[in-house]
UniProtKB/Swiss-Prot annotation:
Stated family: Belongs to the adenylosuccinate synthetase family.
Binding, IMP: D23, E24, G25, K26, N48, A49, G50, H51, T139, R153, Q234, T249, R321
EC number(s) reported in the record: 6.3.4.4
GO biological process, one term: 'de novo' AMP biosynthetic process
UniProt-listed InterPro entries: Adenylosuccin_syn_GTP-bd, Adenylosuccin_syn_Lys_AS, Adenylosuccinate_synth_dom1, Adenylosuccinate_synth_dom2, Adenylosuccinate_synth_dom3, Adenylosuccinate_synthetase, P-loop_NTPase
Residue sites binding substrate per the record: S317, V318, T319, G320, R321, P322, R323
Active site: D23, H51
Residues engaged in binding Mg(2+): D23, G50
Catalysed reactions, as listed in the record: IMP + L-aspartate + GTP = N(6)-(1,2-dicarboxyethyl)-AMP + GDP + phosphate + 2 H(+)
Species the sequence originates in: Burkholderia lata (strain ATCC 17760 / DSM 23089 / LMG 22485 / NCIMB 9086 / R18194 / 383)
Gene Ontology molecular function terms on file: adenylosuccinate synthase activity; GTP binding; magnesium ion binding
Protein name in UniProt: Adenylosuccinate synthetase 1
Subunit field text: Homodimer.
Highest taxon above the source species: Bacteria
Length: 448
């Protein structure tokens, strides 16, 4: 190694994670931060969560490809912690290329990434149908079953596509197992071996130029002075271990997953940015202590919650499902900060609160008559939480597009200051609109 290489200062690495139940606005913030990064990394999840970007008034939804793809010259990485649907990937690539975005020269996919196959989707959908009213509310895209295969050491990975015979042998073995479950337990139809084999092997030549040793590339890039941005999907309260289990996703969504899911040592992660909306939302089933509105629940029709849903356009970017809405839960936020080791917060959608007469903040709970200041573990205990609120005067002035703290209404400043006090970490960024430029910066994650 040359002396000059030894003397290069390593780049900074920032991890962006959601602190709620997903849909916090991570995509916009990742896109904004990419101005200071040379690489963006997806490290978990699949195409079950969409990151929405508004750039120059144009809306783009990315499900698999890192948000950095919208910035020319930025390398994008899909790590080993992701579960990959080749069909969804090439659909997304096609949409981006039609819009004039160069993808294939800048996208690197770990050879160890788990594949989503047709039988994963069939099982996911059949399982939800069988559960009926007790369903978790998955997107039906095969994410969970693919992770189950990974943990069960049955998974087929990207690198397996390049050995057709071995792939066929392992596929047949997997189908023996999964078709039994589909037909004998879930009451579904069997998945055809030959059709699945032909479809999957048909992706091999198209994928191969993008397949790489992502862990090594990230190590070398960072040591050469490049800044890297790790882009989480979903949110901490959906984490398979730390979320409101069993109403969770099938992967680890916390900051620590960036290390395992991309093959990067934990000491390389310099700053953890926790994204929180100025209120809370949740999609699908599961407890939600500060809930105000649920389109499917006649008992949850509070008018403020309806306003939050309508003004905030709270509909899933992938599924289109209406999101449940509620006040910001700072006790749940404390749990997320603890688990992730959050360095600073970014509050998004502050502008959605504009015009409300009052704004409430959940600062703790009553659980069976006892005080609690942090979200408990597990859905059953969370369901017993009765929120304890602090109430703030609202603000009538518009915060849309504001770019400095001083320009915010005094009551909005008071609300943000209290969130910061209760959370115990600074609010370093505030988003005041969907466009990348509608952002207040108080401390820069790459420069702390």
């Amino acid at each position: 190694m040359s002396a000059s290489a030894v003397n290069v200062t390593p780049g900074r690495n920032v991890v962006v994670v959601g602190t709620q139940w997903g849909d916090e606005g991570k995509g916009k913030i990742v896109d904004w931060l990419t101005d200071h990064a040379q690489g963006v990394v997806r490290f978990q999840g699949g195409h079950n969560a969409g990151h929405t970007l508004i750039i120059g008034g144009k809306k783009t939804i990315l499900r698999l490809i890192p948000s950095g793809i919208m910035r020319e010259g930025v390398a994008c990485y899909i790590g080993n912690g992701v579960v990959l649907s080749p069909e969804a990937l090439f659909k997304e690539i096609g949409e981006l290329e039609e819009a004039g975005v160069n993808v294939r020269d800048r996208l690197f996919i770990s050879e160890a990434t788990t594949l989503i196959l047709p039988y994963h989707i069939a099982i996911d959908q059949a399982r939800e149908a069988r559960k009926g009213a007790g369903k978790i509310g998955t997107t039906g895209r095969g994410i969970g079953p693919a992770y189950e295969d990974k943990v069960g050491r049955r998974a087929l990975r990207v690198q397996d596509l390049f050995d057709a015979k071995t792939f066929a042998d392992r596929l047949r073995e997997n189908l023996d197992f999964h078709n039994f479950v589909l037909t004998q337990y879930l009451g579904g139809a069997a998945v055809d071996f030959q059709a699945t084999l032909d479809t999957m092997l048909g992706y091999a030549d198209r994928l191969k130029p993008m397949v790489a040793d992502v862990s090594r590339r990230l190590y070398d890039a960072n040591n050469a002075g490049q800044n890297l941005l790790f882009e989480g999907a979903q949110g901490t309260l959906l984490d398979i271990d730390h979320g409101t289990y069993p109403f969770v996703t099938s992967s680890n969504c916390v900051a620590g997953a960036a290390s395992a899911g991309a093959g990067v040592g934990p000491q390389k992660l310099n700053y953890i940015l926790g994204i929180t909306k100025a209120y809370c939302t949740r999609v699908g089933s599961g407890p939600f202590p500060s809930e105000l509105y649920d389109a499917d629940n006649p008992q949850r029709q509070d008018q403020v919650g309806v306003t939050l849903a309508n003004v905030g356009k709270e509909f899933g970017s992938v599924t289109g499902r209406p999101r449940r809405t509620g006040w910001l839960d700072a006790a749940a936020l404390r749990r997320s900060i603890q688990i992730n080791g959050v360095s600073g917060l970014c509050m998004t959608k502050l502008d959605v609160l504009d015009g409300l007469d009052e704004v409430k903040l959940c600062v703790g709970y009553k659980i069976d008559g006892k005080d609690a200041d942090i979200l408990p573990r597990g859905a059953a205990d969370v369901a017993r939480c009765e929120p304890v609120y602090e109430t703030f005067a609202g603000w009538k002035e518009s915060t849309v597009g504001i770019k400095t703290w001083e320009a915010l209404p005094a009551n909005a400043q008071a609300y943000l200051t209290r969130v910061q006090e209760v959370a115990g970490v600074p609010v370093d960024m505030v988003s005041t609109g969907p466009d990348r430029d509608e952002t207040i910066l108080l401390r820069h994650p790459f420069k702390v």
